[in-house]
Structure formats: structure tokens, C-alpha cells
């Protein structure tokens, strides 16, 4: 309820004075008015606000006051409960029906006189001379009796005739007639049929402050939204107050149309209409049928037409999600970049006689990725945001598969015709770029126009950048950065890094002197916890356990518990008794002694293994290995970052058609130290080997045992396949004996 109605306003009030009065209180200056409709003659007005909280503040301030110079003003919320569909359609029909029924009743009353009046008139009327004679009366009585007997005879004969004709066929005919008279199911209107065919809605009368995120959030309660498009003016760049919403399911679009039409959103009354299909998609929306054995909408197409349709479909699907790794780079560009730096040709770099070409290319890609990540960090990009499940921005585009030698000027010239650019980033290797637009409309237009477009000898792969990708909104490189500004930024970054480090216990503290605090308020921070507990005797440290925020990259969330350490175990015991039930930020604490290493185990289970320091394992599990990879390839690739103690590359038990046993697509590596394993995981987590992205994670100790068990199981299955007779005998053992016991029969 973000729309208010003001009653009992003075009739001399004008719109400008009314608006100024609404914004005059200091507490209401920050409110956003989205719509005002003043009707001075009727002394009321409608005012729309951005959200219900602002409307509530205004209502509490002006309700029952004399702020507008007239009588006492009454302020109330405008109800946005729309009439039901049946009431909308049948209200007029019901009123007409009621009036016509009343008219028929009046006519019927006029046509049917009162019975008592008729009886009175017959008594008061004189006797007819013809009826006074005895003969006439006798004949009249006989005629009356005769008529009564005839009528009685007819009435007695009707049931017999009905019973005679009441056979099954007649009953069925009457039943069918009754069914035909029943009301049929309501047919869908033309608007509803259009929505079911396109899954698209057109929304009007939006506030100019409406964003695609807020509108999508409002409509997404009825189903998944694939696209939200807010048109803007080509000259001023201001929104037009309209929007197009593309739903994933047509039923969800129809439900949103019925529920949200004529409702209030951000202080304005929405007008929801069915949206037409996008240009070029009318055929898909119209559906298809079969006539004379041929499918409508299909014809004999040439190879070129089919290829163009496939390309168009690929471009359309590319805008819906993440199709490539965020740091994907063209292998040819990587090789060219490294070869250029070394002063050699690509053929010399990838010479098969001098070493493994696949491993060389993978190591070169790893080097280029490290340089690119360092460049992006200096440019203010949050690397943690480059995850596939992070929400996507509407103004940032990642440009991948760029050929080597592309300059930042050529990249700017490619995207600038589609709109105003905020920033363009291109690392020294020139294999991955970032382009940010000022307007999401321009970014969408550029994405559609340049996706899968050829640039040099490569095809561009575009991906929408993640939300919160940049640390600051200001674009880097706008002006020369002074030495003082650079020092301030370095000092600020160092301070943030120091603050993010967890408090470590003093090595001189006794064992068992750390307490576990459960039930902390999620708003409680580590500095606040230290301030509250620092007065306790023997206090050493205090910290709130944090985890990364998946919705806001670079920020952290409280996990609702923490730890406090003391110098001695005796001090910890006294603090345990004092802190039990103690309230911090309105939450009562539950305190107990912490178990050594429990917090690390808890972090490993909940937080994952992203940083490597949360587990001390030296074993790494490598997934998504190409089946062509050999032990030599894997050993050469990983031995560049540490010494390997063991390497296991499981193979399939059943040989292929060529007679060789192919790998199963994963491997187990064991390094000498945990530091080497962590360094290898950090360096190779974005690397490709033979075109496949390597997926690295810490291996649990029990996984190898499971692999051995699976291997024994597969061996048993293969042995059973070879010994088919034994399997048949085991299937025929109906007495429930052991499978391995032989029954003495020979096959």
C-alpha cells in the first residue's frame, strides 16, 4: 500500500502548493513522490510514494492535522483490491436483470386482479335471467359435470400414455437435452489467449524511478522472469514509464496478469496488458499444426537458412545465462601472447619434439590468468564475484575469446556506437576484456548486436558481468592518479586486509582457555564483541565467526556464534559462569568450552574449501579430466607447483573398441606439503587441459577407500559376465542358499 488518499482538503489548494506542503517537514524531505492527482472541486487528492514505509510516515504525519490551511485532513491508504472477474463482467447484467424482473412482476400484478374482489363483484352483480330458469340451471349443471368428467378422464389417461412412451430412448433424449441446457465452461478471452501464446506482458503507468530489478522482483512472485525490458527515450535517456516482461511459463504470465492488473506499485496504478511477441518470433508464438501430412510453418529450407536460424537461436540463448567460464581465454591468443613475450614463434613454443604441447599450453594459460587477475585487482574488480551463480549485472559485459593483438582502442570502437561507455578494461595479455555501459538499454543492444560476432580471426563470446563486480562506482583511468592518492588507496587496502584477518590466540595462553559463544545477534561485530568482553580479567581475544556473503561479493555475514579466549583456564572458568545467560545486542548467550580445532572443522563443512587454509589435507581431487590425458600430462602440469608423492589416474575396467582402457575422467594427487597443494589449486582452478576446464577440490581420506571398493565391485561384475553359467545357476537357486555355493549341476 504505497498510495494515499487525502480527504477534506481546501477547495483553493493548487498542485504546486500541495506538493510543497507534502515535502516541507524535515522528516519527509527524503520521501519520493511518484504521482499526485488533486481534485480541488471535490476536495480530495491521491498521492503515490516509492514504497509502503514512506507512505506510512506521511500518513502518520498529516492524518488529523490542519497542515493545508483548511479543515482537519483525513489520510488513508488506497485499497488495491481489484474486483473479481465475475463481478466486473456481470455487474451490469445483474442490474439489468433485476430491473427487468421488477418490471415483469409489476405487469403480472396488474394482469392478475384480487380473488376476493372477483368474489365480491360476482355476489353484488344481478342474476342473469337466462340462468334463473330451472332448465338452464339443470343443463348448466349437467354440462359442468360432463366437463369435469372429461377433464378427469384426460388427467387419468396422461400418466398411462407417459408410462408407455417412457422407454430408454426417450429418457436418453431428455437427459441429453438437459445436459445441452447446462452452462458451458467459460472461454478464454482474446487477451488471455495472446498471453498464453507469447508468455509476455506489457506494463504501463510505471513510475519513472522504477528499475528492472524492482519490477522483476514484484512480478517474480508469480513465476520465473526471463527478461525485463524498460524502454527509454532515445534523446534524453529517461524511462518512458512502460515495460515488457517475458515469463518462462505462459501460465505464470496469465496469473500475474489477472492478479496485478489495476493494482498499486510504487504509488501508481498499474495497467497490465498482453504483450505481443518479439519481432522475428511471431511464428513461434502462433504454434504449429498438421494439414495434409505437412507441418504448418515448416518448408523446405536450404543449408544456409538452417545455419542462420541456428546462429540466431545461439545468440538468443547466450543472453539467458553463463555459457562459458568467467576467465575463459582463446588458446591461440594465449599461445601467441606467451610466444611474443619469449621472443619465439608459436610453432617453437608448441613443438611436440621438445615436450608435451598440451601441458605447455595449460601452463601458459595459467600464467596469463594470473596476470589478468592481478590486473583486475588493481583496476578495482572483486575477483570473488566471478562465480557462475552470482546475479548478473545489466550494464557490464565480459568480452572473451579475444584474438591476440587487440587493443583497448579497437575494443572501444567496437562497443562505443551502441551507447555511452563508463569504462573499458583490457589486461596486457589482451585475451579478456570488460566493458561497462552507463545505460542498461545500451548494454543490452550491444550484447545482442555483438554476440558471436567475428573479430579478427576469432569469434567473440559475450557474458553479462556479475553484480558487485567493481569495488567503487567511479571508473578508473579517468584522470591521472597522484602519488598521494595511490598511497591512500594502498593504506586503505592494507587496513581492510588487516581487519579481515581473524583474531588468533596468544601462544602463551593455556590449552582449554577458549569459550564458545552461541546465540550471538547477527548484527554483532568483532570490534563490538571485543569492547563488551575486554573488561573481563584475563581477556585475550574475541571474534565473531564470519562467512562470505553469496549475494554481495566481497562482504561477509555473521554465522551467529563466536569465540573468546583467556590467558588461563581459571579465568575462562570464571568467565563461563559470568557469561552464561548474559545478553549482547538483545540476544542471550549460551557459553561452553570450545574444543580445539572444532571451529576449523565447522568452517570446512559450511564454508567449503575455497581458500585451502581451512583444511590441512595434502590430497587433491582433479575432476573433468579429458579421457585422452595421461599420467605424464597430469604429472608435468601439477609438478610445476610442488613435489608429488603419488598420482593415481583410475581407468575403466571394460576396454574400449580399440582395446585400450580409457581413463574415468578424474585423478587423485598427493603433494609433499599442504602449502604446495594449496598453491597448485589456486593457480590451476581456471586452467584448461586439452580444452576441458579442470575442477579441483580437496580429497577426503575416505574417497580412496571408496574407489577401491568400487573397483572390486566392477571386477566382480566383469567376472560374473565372463562366467555366465554361474550367474544362471544363481538365478535358479530358489531355496535361498548362498550365491557362491555350487549345486553340483553342470551346464
From Swiss-Prot:
* Domain spans labelled RRM: 2-80, 199-277, 395-467, 513-596, 618-701
- What Pfam families does its record include? RRM_1
Q: Name one GO molecular function term.
A: RNA binding
**Where does the record say this protein resides?**
Nucleus
Keyword entries, A-Z: Nucleus, Repeat, Ribonucleoprotein, RNA-binding, rRNA processing
Q: Return the Acidic residues bias intervals.
A: 157-169
Q: Which GO terms describe its cellular component?
A: nuclear speck; nucleolus; ribonucleoprotein complex
Q: What is this protein called?
A: Multiple RNA-binding domain-containing protein 1
Please give the residue ranges the record annotates as the region Disordered. Answer: 83-117, 129-169, 595-615, 718-747
Instruction: Name the predominant localization.
Output: nucleus
Annotated family: Belongs to the RRM MRD1 family.
Protein role: Involved in pre-rRNA processing.
Recorded hits in InterPro entries, A to Z, give:
Mrd1_RRM3, Nucleotide-bd_a/b_plait_sf, RBD_domain_sf, RRM_dom, RRM_MRD1_RNA_proc_ribogen
Positions with biased composition (Basic and acidic residues): 143-156, 597-614
Record organism: Cryptococcus neoformans var. neoformans serotype D (strain JEC21 / ATCC MYA-565)
Q: Name one GO biological process term.
A: rRNA processing
Q: Which PROSITE patterns match?
A: RRM (PS50102)
Question: Is Metal-binding given among the entry's keywords?
Answer: no
